[in-house]
Amino acid sequence: MSMNPAALIPPADSIPVHWAWLEGFLLLTFGFHLLFMNSVVGSAVIATVRAVTRPQDPAPTLLGKALPSLLALTINFGVAPLLFAQVLYGGFLYTSSVIMAVYWLGLIFVLIAAYYLLYGFSGSRRKKKNGTVFIAAACALLLFTGFVLVNNVTLMLSPDRWVGYFEKQDGSMLNLGD
């Protein structure tokens, strides 16, 4: 007998205002988060490429000074849309987060490491060292963060894949099918 994936969908919670208010705030705050996120990832990639191809170029040094602050702003501006999504789609977001809990909770440590690596890159550039390893590793961690976040959202949107949890109950399931 196969399980009906629709049976796994939790009932909707009541919300204190009309959903359109929360949806509007979600879209507004997520837009700000996207602006900062694109600035961080784009600047980190540019700094990595320039540090490798033109080590004496001042652009990576200037970007290195700004990147830690940009990452902090990106994280702060990412909290509000996450909270609005939790209110609007709580049952789905919570379930997908539990299914991939190892990666979801690991994001805290990944972002802390990326933050320190960005500071390491900035410090190495001030000391007239290249620091390519720092920025390349930070780029990899930032891209991994994006992968995990997108994976969580696609898993949230695919309740039919939640039954895979019963085969792999250690919280390390990823939605690699999309």
Named regions from a protein language model:
Residues 41-60:
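Membrane-interface helix-loop junction between the first two transmembrane segments
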Residues 46-48, 82, 150:
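Hydrophobic alpha-helical segments of integral membrane proteins
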Residues 35-45, 110-113:
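Hydrophobic alpha-helical transmembrane segments
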Residues 27, 58-69, 125-144:
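Alpha-helical transmembrane segments and their helix-start/interface "positive-inside/aromatic belt" motifs
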Residues 69-136:
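Membrane-interface helix-loop-helix modules in multi-pass inner-membrane proteins
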Residues 69-77, 136-155:
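Hydrophobic alpha-helical membrane-insertion segments
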Residues 1-30, 58-59, 81-102, 155-178:
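Membrane-interface interhelical loops and short amphipathic "cap" helices
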